[in-house]
Every structure is written in structure tokens, then in C-alpha cells.
């Protein structure tokens, strides 16, 4: 497997890998990474669909990319997906996945046209004082000292960031700024999370720094992630006769690691219909393992019941499976680095379905748009800056479900601090019913207090979801804590998803999951075509200059607080570049 960039490799079709007709594949899980692996096995690996087996313990595919209406409960979206125009693997695959809505076009075509015709941007990024614009006004509000802290992290070698926290690099100069408000709520970072991952994020999205305050950097699908992404992939795979096995729980994968240069997956232990079974493997049987799981132990409440906070990792789950696998070889990772403390990895979301028009005026007052036009509504999350829960909420294009009533609006609410008492509901979010979470949200969008309970009861249905391990991948880590996608010496197995290691890309993104799927297939089948490298904006001087200026709210480098000697040094450098292309470039991007 090798990386590439440019159209030559992107538009090429690889030859059929040698010996693929004699191989089979078993994929543990059916999340985005797993489905991506299956798609690449079929498309570029040219493996017969009948030879590809997807083992899913639940009744539905998709993993964390869900969206479903539960009978007697309501609509549930545990999370949402923010896309980028440089998710190189994602678009490489979705150009080949047919739309399930429009005949003759791909998922990429559909998505591209939608976001061209209806570009995303926010008209209100944050509120205070019960629905009033917080007037962040597109500013990062970073001091020179704070900017230098970010720059220091940016240039610190990865080797020096092992097991380091964000607070090891940032103090209040950054943590009290609009920059951190935007960043933590958009990506769900906490102060104690990995400094390494923070650095990777800054480098990965350096080309989008200027688009963070108003979300012009983002793109969204038409419907929820399940209907817009997962279903088309499943239909594509089913059309190629890929075998989906639901209700099949993988308890363990057994390996022979006696030869470090020839590690072999020998058996998959499964539980099917309550009975233990074993799938014996040869070197021609490839195994793709989704290890860990950010939505494991997630629980749903209801309008009148809180979601249970269940932190016990039981036998048979994704974390238990990874622990059993990790015990067999040091290169298979250290799961307990990520799942040892759910108090540091949990947050909650809730899906609010409006049942009439009574709440809508308060939404319009904040987002300045009508939710029922089919176009962008909030344009990304609206953060309640003075919320003790650190609540944010968003409304994507409506309807979010094909079956959704035309006059109902779905609102996604999430909070990072589930253990803090609310501002209107005086108890932690994790103890609240759906109705109570809705009441807290209504309070913060400016509904008069004497109407809050009535509207939460009769004008909305709210389903809360607790996810104890949703931020597990953000915990401070070191090299080796996550297994490589294909560990050294592997003959017939690979790891997939957010807890597999691939260089430069960032976790908690659709692209990361899909990249692990592509890399796994290309490596094990020796597919002779380049895997598109992570977009290289961090190596583009134009993006670096633009981000430097935008991060400082348009201030020129010459306006920094400098001593006399520093000013003289800058003046001397500027004299040296006068009349050159360097001066021209620096002026073009507002650096000088």
C-alpha cells in the first residue's frame, strides 16, 4: 500500500489482485469503516460479493452513523456528521456508490450539487442571556500569547506529545477565547484530552481556520447520516451479493503470533442465536476487525425517562473483544488507555421533534431562517455560551428523514458537561428526562418561563441519549496504544475504525473511518493503486499564511506586541524581501 495525490492515481482503475478469487473476507462490525472495507473489497479488490461476510451483532448496519424512528419513542440521531471538501477517501468511494434517490447519479454527485446550490454558513454561532446573539462576530479573540501557544503546539514533534493533555500547552489565554469555544463545541474536545490529537486537528484543517467561526468550512448531507450514507453503501453491497449476518456477535479473534513476522488470525469466536460457534480461518481468509467502539453502552431515554448512565463494559462488547485480542500480542494496542474513565469521555445528545408551530418563532429569531424551506437552517451548531451544561444545538436541512412529517422540525441538542446542574432544570443532564432537557433548551432559546413546561410537554417530543465512551478516542495516548491498521507481520488481518492507527489523519471524522477501511483492503490484497494521502494543506504556504492571519482576526504580523530588538529584526527582514515574490505573497494574504 502506498499514498498518492493527483488525478493520475485518482482516476486509474487497478488490475484485479492476484489470487483474489481464492480469498474470503470476514468483517467484524458494520459501521462506516467496515462498510468501506466491504465496498473496496468489491470495487477495487474485485472480490466476489459472496465471499464477503459482514458480521453485525445488532439488527441494523451503520454503527455510530445512525438515524432511526423508534416505535413509541420517536426519532433518534445520536450524532451528526460534518464533512470537508478534502475528505479524499470518502469522495473516492462515494463517486462509485449509486444514489438511492436519484437514478443515474452517485452519492457524491448528489452531495456536490446540494452543497453548491445551498452552501452552508451560520448567521448566529453562539447565544447568551436566553437567546440573544453572543456577538462572537466571526472573531477568534486570541491574544498574541495565546496565538504563540497554538503555534508552539503546531510545531511540537509528535514524539514529544505522547500522553500529553491539551492543558499541558494551553492556558486561559486560549481556553477562555472564542477560538476554544468554537473548537471544543464543534469537535467535542475537552481540556483534558490529547494534545497530540489537538495538533493533528489544527494541521489537518489549517485550510479551514478562516471558516470555523461561521461554518463556511462545512458541508452536510441532505438527510441524516444513516439514510444519506449508510443505506446507499448497504444497497451497493447487497447488489454485489455481499453477505450480511445480523445478530452475530464476535466474542474474540484468536491469533497465532509465535512468529513475529508471520502473525495469523486463526479463528473467529462468535455467538449466533445464543449459541457459541467458531469460524476457522486460513491464510486466504481475511479478517477486518472494528476494535473498541465510541457508542458502546449508549442508552436511550424517552420523553419521560432519563437515559441510563451505564459504564460497565460487559463481556461480548467491542471493548471486551479488543481486550481479548490485545492480550495476544503487544502490537494489538492498549484499549484501557481509552475506556478507563467514562467521566472524561461521556457526553449526551437529544433529538427534539417539534409537533406544532409554537417553538418555531424562537428558532427563527436565533438562526434568522425558516426551518421548513428545505435549505440550510442553523448552518452548524449554535452554542449557548452561558449554559452550565455547555449546550449546543443544530437544525440541519429539513426534513432529516424521508418519512418525517413536513410540518415537524428535528433539532439535535448536545452537551459536554453532563454532570453539572442546569440553569433552568436544576439537576445534571444525565438525570433528566427528554422533556426536562427540552425545557432547558427552551429556556436558553428565550421561551418565556411560564410557557416552557407547556411547550416541552405538548409541542415537542424529546429522546435523550447517553454515550459514556463517545470521546474515548480523544484521551491522551502514546504510540502503540492503537494498533496499526495492518500490524507489522500481519498475514490476513487488519484493524478498522477510530481506534486503529493511520498517520496524519484525525479521529471522530467520517474520513478517518473510511481511510482505515481503504488502507486495510489495499494492504491485505496488495491493490496496485495509490491510497489518496491526507490533504496536504499543512504543507501549503498559502494556507499557512491565511490561517496565521485569520487566527489573529486579520491582524498583520507587524502588529504583534514586540520589543525594540524584535521590531528592528522584522524591519531588516522586510527590507531584504522588498520587491520580491515573497513580499507580494505576504501582502496578498495580509501578513504585512
Regions found by a protein language model. Give the residues of each.
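Extreme N-terminal leader/targeting segments of oxidoreductases
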Residues: 1-25, 43-51, 69, 551-592
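Beta1-alpha1 glycine-rich phosphate/pyrophosphate-binding loop at the start
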Residues: 1-3, 37, 41, 45-85, ...
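N-terminal glycine-rich phosphate/pyrophosphate-binding loop and immediately adjacent elements
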Residues: 13, 19-149
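Alpha-helix N-cap/helix-initiation motif
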Residues: 30, 79, 83, 222, ...
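Rossmann-like flavin
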Residues: 100-207, 218-220
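Glycine- and aromatic-enriched mobile tails/lids
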Residues: 121-122, 126, 481-483, 499-508, ...
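Helical element adjacent to the flavin cofactor pocket in flavoenzyme catalytic cores
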Residues: 203-286, 291-292, 304-305, 311-313, ...
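C-terminal segments that line or cap access tunnels to active or ligand-binding sites in enzymes
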Residues: 206-221, 280, 284-286, 291-516, ...
